[in-house]
A protein has these predicted regions:
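An acidic site on a long C-lobe helix of protein kinase domains
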Residues: 122-125, 175
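Membrane-anchoring alpha-helices and their flanking helix-loop junctions
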Residues: 1-114, 130-247
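Short, amphipathic, aromatic/basic-enriched membrane-interface segments that mark the entry/exit
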Residues: 112-123
Length: 247
């Protein structure tokens, strides 16, 4: 049985324009999702960066780059990554009929295989990765950039594949399996980039052939965010443990 009552059929736009994707931030479901990033994810990343500087100090590692270089460089990376996440989240919201944050509205009700999602399955991860690296550069922490960032990337890949995509398979069935086989998770292929530039869908389905939006969300979808919170706490604990070991 589903965790929620049947969903109203959303008005979907399969290929939303760029401006509409950015304007979608005015939707409560979308800006609440961004609030989680600002008030939960960003502070957690700041704590990890601080732990990285403590490990640097314990190991005698100097800060990377002069402050006059790393601050504008890092801010530029954070801004670029943030704009990319803003765009792809807006695209998913308009084309998929739901927020990327399942804790807000249960998530998309239609599978999206156009725009940036015809190129890779999780385009927002690239923007987040760019922002996290930029944050580490601002802090100047070698430990954060060399050790923490790869761990965060692995964590993201694992949770996307075995948590987020599990719900996508339950929600969209065999179509998502075909989509996953055709579209890589994070590293775009030339064919995917070409599809994006030509504004082609990954599954090459005509609009008239698309199935209707799903009528309900998979059981357990509302608890997905709790897994991410537990993961963040465990990661911070791991990095704090490394600091304790080397201090």
């Amino acid at each position: 049985m589903s965790d929620a009552p049947p969903l109203p059929a959303p008005a979907l736009v399969r290929r939303p324009p760029l401006g509409d994707c950015f304007a979608a931030i005015t939707s409560p479901a979308l800006y609440r999702n961004f609030a989680i990033h600002i008030f939960v994810m960003f502070p957690a990343a700041m704590v990890m960066c601080w732990l990285g500087t403590r490990i640097d100090a314990a190991l005698g590692w100097a800060s990377i780059l002069p402050e006059s270089v790393r601050v504008p460089l890092g801010l530029g990376m954070i801004g670029s990554g943030g704009l990319w996440v803003w765009y792809v989240y807006g695209y998913l919201f308009l084309a998929g009929g739901g927020s990327p944050g399942t804790h807000v509205d249960g998530g998309p009700v239609a599978m999206v295989d156009t725009g940036p999602y015809t190129m890779i399955r999780h385009p927002s991860v690239l923007g987040k990765l760019l922002g996290v690296i930029g944050l580490g550069i601002i802090w100047g922490s070698q430990a954060f950039l060399v050790f923490f960032v790869p761990v965060l990337l692995v964590y993201s890949v694992v949770t996307n594949r075995y948590l987020q995509e599990r719900f996508c398979e339950e929600r969209f069935g065999a179509r998502y399996g075909v989509y996953r086989q055709r579209v890589p998770m994070l590293l775009p292929r030339p064919a995917g980039v070409a599809r994006w530039l030509r504004d082609e869908a990954a599954l090459a389905e005509a609009d008239a052939e698309l199935p209707p939006p799903v009528a309900s969300h998979p059981p357990g979808i509302w608890s997905e965010f709790r897994f991410y919170l537990v993961g963040l706490v465990l990661l911070i604990s791991l990095f704090a443990g490394i600091w304790w070991m080397v201090a």
